[in-house]
Structures are given as C-alpha cells and as structure tokens.
C-alpha cells in the first residue's frame, strides 16, 4: 500500500529483501529492489546499519519500516534522522516511550491508567520469574518487550510449561528484534482489542480516526480492523 501511494505521487520506490523473499509481490512491485542478506532476519532485516548504507548509496530520501523488525527501534530511527533520511513514523523520543512495552507500561502508570497484573521489568532469571507467575496465576502471557507483530508472545497454561515457553519467547524475540527482553502478564482470554489511531505530521497537524475494533487476530496479530467498533457506545 505504501509503494502504491508513492507511485501515484510520482515517488520512486526501493525495496529491500532477504534471499527468502526475492520472489514476493512487494519486491516485484518496487522500482528497484536490493537484497539485504540471507533468510535469517538477524542477517538481513535487522541489519540497520547495512540498510541505512543502502539508503545512502541510492540517495534515498525517506525510509518506511513496515511492521516488526526495526519498525519500533528508536536507535535505528535516530540513526536514520542523523543521516538526513526521513523516518516515516514516530520520533525517536516517542518510540523510546512507547516502542518498548516495558517503557510504555512505565509511562502509562504515571497517569493512573489500569493495567493487567504482571511484572514491569525485563525478566533476567527465568526460574525466579516462575514464582511470580504462580502468584499472578495461570494462564500467563509471555511478551517480548520490543517490536510487535505478535512475535515473542507465548501463552503458558500451566507451571510445568513455563520455563520452556519463556526460553522459546526469548529466542524468538532475539531473532525477530535483536532484543530478547521479555516480561509476563496475566493472560486475558477472548478480550476486546480496541484502538484509537492518531496521525500527526511534521507540520503539527494531528487527527484521530476514532476507534477501531481489532479483536479478530491470528497469533496475536490483527487480521481485520473494523471502524467504528460495534460494541462501544458513542
């Protein structure tokens, strides 16, 4: 969708891809496509410095991160900005506050907004965190602190599965975002996922697009967004 809009506006597009994605539609649709590395994301889509060097070599004006990988990485955003490349997304400061779920929880807590019971810091000792998980009560949701796209998230139904699922979540978060930090929360089954989307540009114009019903998901990733939500009152 981003490239389609760019083409309608007469803006040339460049796609980066791993060897595994060389025949995908977005690669063929772009005006130019550059292979950034082999299939593992740690050797391709997470190589921020390499991606920025490609931008410089091709005189790219702006970079759109898509979702997952480096899309919520404040360090990458700052490096792009410092290199004179427009990052199409939040500022590094905003990303530091909200791109990391633990930092976001800390920010939200200051406003007295209710949150699901859980821990507010990255887990460094898996065995000790099992004690906390038992206090919260199963099922437990293990969540990667960085990134999005449903990566690094595991539902743990019982204590016997906790250590294994924690280690799997840490490994997935590390390979997907380059950051293996995870935390735990009480798992809420069949919740309503409601978002209010806010858009702002560099000129200070801000608009909200009302609420969106995002409860239909697959692997903790939204499949359909419906606006307005049919369950909320005006």
Regions found by a protein language model. Name each.
Residues 1-234:
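N-terminal beta-alpha lobe that positions the nucleotide/phosphoryl donor
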């Amino acid at each position: 969708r981003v490239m389609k809009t760019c083409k309608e506006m007469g803006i040339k597009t460049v796609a980066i891809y791993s060897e595994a994605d060389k025949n995908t539609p977005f690669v063929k649709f772009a005006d130019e496509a550059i292979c950034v590395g082999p299939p593992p994301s740690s050797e391709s889509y997470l190589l921020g410095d390499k991606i920025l060097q490609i931008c410089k070599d091709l005189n790219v004006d702006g970079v759109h991160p898509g979702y997952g990988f480096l899309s919520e990485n404040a360090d990458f955003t700052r490096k792009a900005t410092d290199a004179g490349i427009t990052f199409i997304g939040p500022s590094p400061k905003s990303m530091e506050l909200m791109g990391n779920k633990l930092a976001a929880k800390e920010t939200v807590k200051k406003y007295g907004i209710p949150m699901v019971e859980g821990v507010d810091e990255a887990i460094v000792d898996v065995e000790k965190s099992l004690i906390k998980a038992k206090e919260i009560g199963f099922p437990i949701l293990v969540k990667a602190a960085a990134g999005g796209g449903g990566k690094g998230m595991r539902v743990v139904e019982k204590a016997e599965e906790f250590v294994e699922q924690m280690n799997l979540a840490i490994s997935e978060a590390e390979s997907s975002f380059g950051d293996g930090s995870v935390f735990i929360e009480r798992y809420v089954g069949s919740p309503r996922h409601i978002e209010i989307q806010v858009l702002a540009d560099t000129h200070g114009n801000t608009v909200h697009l009302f609420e969106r019903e995002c409860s239909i998901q697959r692997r903790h990733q939204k499949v359909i967004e419906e606006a307005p939500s049919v369950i909320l009152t005006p």
